[in-house]
């Protein structure tokens, strides 16, 4: 009797282990799906960067718009996928890409050397100039890069603008903030004296904040253009993305996306 019970328990244990092994193999197979086998394409972005990506109420629903989003939709459409958008802090985007939470990142990214160590980049799809936003009342006070010496100047955490602040604004004090609206609020309230941002983005914030303006001096920047990021080694997806970028840039559709995003970002 005891022998029968032992045999039954042993058989149950073997079956449990076998089922666990099968489950593990199925899970691994699902995680290793090729791009063409997946039904969805997941975009990681930080939707506080109009006209690239931003929130807007459309027909009573909070919607993420922008030309990065329009380009991502085009990529998903060409790959016959459903686009899923994940909105997160800019500084966490590349980490989320590398841990597999998203398939690609479009967020006005420029491929600097540090980022190139972490991810692979597409061909550029848009080139923009950098500027410094100041309060209108300070127009005569801040007339050059050097005039910000010993003054606090804001840039988004993890952005190219952080590097610009350190390299081009000698003696200034960098204040890194996670969200651009926080930077604009800090500028309007007098907590910082300037905000470094791309011109197209600056125009959107200035339209909503008439007390602000773009400072009347150039911000030097070696433009590498905005690119899409994918996980290192994901050449399959990168090839799809570069093919779409080449088509929309050559056809002028990219310009149409930018123009539409500028219109959509006007409140």
For each feature predicted by the language model, list its residue ranges.
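Extracytoplasmic small-molecule ligand-binding "clamshell" domains
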Residues: 32-109
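Short loop->beta-strand "edge-of-pocket" segments that line small-molecule binding or catalytic clefts
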Residues: 42-45, 145-158, 173
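Ligand-binding clefts/hinges and TM-proximal coupling segments of bilobed small-molecule sensing domains
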Residues: 25-31, 82, 160-175, 213-218, ...
């Amino acid at each position: 009797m005891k022998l029968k019970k032992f045999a039954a328990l042993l058989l149950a244990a073997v079956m449990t282990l076998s089922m666990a092994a099968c489950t593990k193999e199925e899970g691994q197979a699902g995680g290793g799906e090729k791009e063409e086998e997946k039904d969805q394409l997941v975009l990681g972005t930080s939707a506080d960067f109009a006209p690239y990506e931003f929130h807007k109420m459309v027909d009573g629903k909070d919607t993420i718009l922008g030309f990065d989003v329009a380009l991502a939709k085009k990529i998903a459409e060409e790959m016959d996928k459903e686009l899923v958008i994940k909105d997160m802090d800019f500084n966490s985007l590349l980490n989320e890409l590398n841990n597999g939470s998203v398939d690609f990142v479009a967020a006005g990214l420029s491929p600097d050397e540090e980022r190139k160590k972490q991810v692979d980049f597409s061909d550029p799809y848009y080139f923009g100039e950098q500027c410094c936003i100041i309060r209108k009342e300070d127009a005569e006070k801040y007339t050059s890069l050097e005039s910000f010496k010993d003054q606090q100047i804001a840039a988004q955490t993890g952005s190219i603008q952080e590097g610009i602040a350190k390299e081009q604004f000698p003696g200034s004090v960098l204040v890194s903030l996670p969200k651009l609206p926080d930077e604009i609020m800090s500028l309007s309230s007098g907590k910082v004296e300037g905000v470094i941002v791309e011109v197209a983005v600056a125009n959107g914030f200035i339209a909503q904040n008439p007390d602000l303006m773009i400072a009347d001096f150039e911000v030097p920047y070696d433009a590498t253009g905005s690119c899409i990021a994918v996980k290192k080694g994901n050449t399959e997806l990168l090839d799809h993305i570069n093919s779409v970028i080449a088509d929309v840039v050559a056809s002028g559709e990219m310009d149409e996306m930018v123009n539409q995003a500028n219109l959509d970002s006007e409140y």
